[in-house]
Amino acid sequence: MSDQKKMTYKDAGVDIDAGNRFVQLIKPLVKATSRPEVLTDIGGFGGLFSLHADKYKKPTLVASTDGVGTKLKLAFMMDKHDTVGIDLVAMCVNDIVVQGAEPLFFLDYMATGKLTPEKAQDVVKGISEGCIQAGCALIGGETAEMPGFYGEGEYDLAGFTVGIVDNTSIIDGSGITVGDRLIGLASSGLHSNGYSLARKVLFEHLGLNADSKVEELDLSVGEELLKPTRIYVKTILNLLRDFQIKGMAHITGGGLVENVPRMMPKNCQAIIHKDSWPKPPIFELLRKAGNIEEEEMYRTLNYGIGMVLVVPETEAEEIMVRLSGLKEDAFIIGEIAKSAEEGEPTVTLI
């Protein structure tokens, strides 16, 4: 027994030294996201953030957590890991800005079978870039090395964000009325939803791979599918300084049909004009190649619209001018009407 080799944590598959090296690699990336309210550097037990609540009459915190889903499979296939972090931040911060909240800080969780510091650093590069785009600070995270739990080279991600809004400025859709206009902000592509369907159509049905080129797309299939989710925070906060936005919907899983009603009061319907915005080529490729019914496209994918705003009819054109000045591709895609029958809000596509 005394001659038995002494075991270490590294022998069991957990490399503490690799974890320490990873922390050193990401310190500049974390620092690049800092805000004046951040009180701690990376490496502490918790991230400290000094809330300047005196700027608000009734400060209200808004929180959200999310992941990237099977889009990660594309990152594994292409061995490209520096953009999925943007997706992670986007999925969280876009969900809180729809209530009028400014994102304050972000935390991430990464779990993998074997930690490769340089690969994990690439992931954090994306998270850092996403936080910069959203104006929030990356104040902490967890990187879990879990031998035998994930396939070789694979990992999973989760994110968490907290934002703030004055209680009197919370956007909940309750003020939406008949005649209000719907403005759609263009997506960059699939964003972070519909990847199980996309992989089935493109890789299984068509027999393509990540490096395949098809005439419908300017990029390879993998590059198109890995386009980062758009972060709408700064655009929306800019609008809120000067205009009334009555409701917003982040168009994720469930598409326009399922997400738009989430912001609407009862007895209303959103009339959406299907020909009011151009459909990006990736969606038409999926629809035709997969023989997917149009209705399924609208209730599964964002179909080219990543965010929907409900605004007063009297302000719609001026808001469109502002959006153009912000280099935002935006379209008036519909209006609010009274429901034909009393009950839950609905979407009508015409």
Swiss-Prot record:
Keywords assigned by UniProt, alphabetized: ATP-binding, Cytoplasm, Ligase, Nucleotide-binding, Purine biosynthesis
Enzyme Commission designation: 6.3.3.1
Zinc among keywords: no
Localization per record: Cytoplasm
GO cellular component entries: cytosol
Pfam families in UniProt: AIRS, AIRS_C
Pathway: Purine metabolism; IMP biosynthesis via de novo pathway; 5-amino-1-(5-phospho-D-ribosyl)imidazole from N(2)-formyl-N(1)-(5-phospho-D-ribosyl)glycinamide: step 2/2
Protein name: Phosphoribosylformylglycinamidine cyclo-ligase
